[in-house]
Amino acid sequence: MKSGTLKTKGFKFKQFSIASSNSGMPVSTDGVLLGAWADFHHCQNLLDIGTGTGLLSLMCAQRYVHLSITAVDIDAHAMEAAQENFSHSPWHSRLQLQHGDVLKLNFTHRFDGIICNPPYFNSGEQAQATQRATARHTDTLAHDALLLRCRELLTPNGKANFVLPLTEGEQFLQLAQQQGWHLHRLCRVKPSPNKPVHRLLFELGLSTATTSEEHLTINDGSTYSAAFVKLCQDFYLKM
């Protein structure tokens, strides 16, 4: 794997912007989907694991005016990017950053909400740049360890939301079940009507619940589907 930094382009949303940076991860549809889909009503304290540029924290801060959000990342470039994006947002007073490994960091309280776009390449060629490798590969944050840590940090009635590709998501859910998690919500995402499901959005909790299942298709022909627009229109400029 070649070392180095990866410059990512900036991205402007309706109420905040993501500046160009060396964070290693550009704004992705996965992240926007998760930030728009995750439900944190009745939550007070949210933990954003692997915040990167701070996208998920900013989306949740926009959606939930009562949330106090702690964002963590192991990468220094990500911390710099998130700090810049937070400081220029309308919600900077509710956004806190911590630099370090979430498996080792000490927190003063538990969280009733967790959001995470986890790494998901378990094998194969590593990403070219160091930051992208950290963001994309499970070498630095294995899924079983992530789930165990989330159990420690989540309140008994809290909720943890994730997005993963189909295969990795199914494996993640199997691990979660083995650890005693319960699947509260599940959304199967397809890029277009004739394409197979390629992403899973899901909410896990430690309390028992009946699973609510739904489907989402991103594109309908040459345009975004009505369901995708409804989900994301508070964020994308051209919706």
Swiss-Prot record:
Name of the protein: tRNA1(Val) (adenine(37)-N6)-methyltransferase
GO BP annotation list: methylation; tRNA processing
Organism: Vibrio vulnificus (strain CMCP6)
Domain of life: Bacteria
Main location: cytoplasm
Catalytic activity as recorded in UniProt: adenosine(37) in tRNA1(Val) + S-adenosyl-L-methionine = N(6)-methyladenosine(37) in tRNA1(Val) + S-adenosyl-L-homocysteine + H(+)
EC number, UniProt record: 2.1.1.223
Matches recorded under InterPro entries: DNA_methylase_N6_adenine_CS, SAM-dependent_MTases_sf, Small_mtfrase_dom, tRNA_Adenine-N(6)_MTase, tRNA_adenine-N6_MeTrfase
Keyword presence, Cytoplasm: yes
Entry's family note: Belongs to the methyltransferase superfamily. tRNA (adenine-N(6)-)-methyltransferase family.
One of the record's GO cellular component terms: cytoplasm
Matching Gene3D superfamilies: Vaccinia Virus protein VP39
SUPFAM superfamilies recorded: S-adenosyl-L-methionine-dependent methyltransferases (SSF53335)
Functional note: Specifically methylates the adenine in position 37 of tRNA(1)(Val) (anticodon cmo5UAC).
